[in-house]
Amino acid sequence: MKTIIEDCTYVMGRGTIVIVELPDELLEYVGDFTYASKVKVGDKVKINSKEYVIKGIEKISTSKFVGLIIGGDDVDNIDNFFGKEIEI
């Protein structure tokens, strides 16, 4: 599945966090306008033709948006991630 990176930030000690809106195919509706991600820690994503392992997932309220933590200092310059396509 492909989607667009909405935002990106680096958090010291946690890694690079990319904010994406997950497609419906990667979500499970659990009720009360709340969704659970089918994407799991350890899954791989591809950004700019480079693969990264998901090291953590941050849920953002009850929306379809999640923050994927994809690594530490080994991640490319995050400025290259804004608005880019991510393959999950």
Regions found by a protein language model. Give the residues of each.
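Beta-strand/loop-dominated core regions that host nucleotide or nucleotide-derived cofactor-binding catalytic loops
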Residues: K2-G15, I19-I88
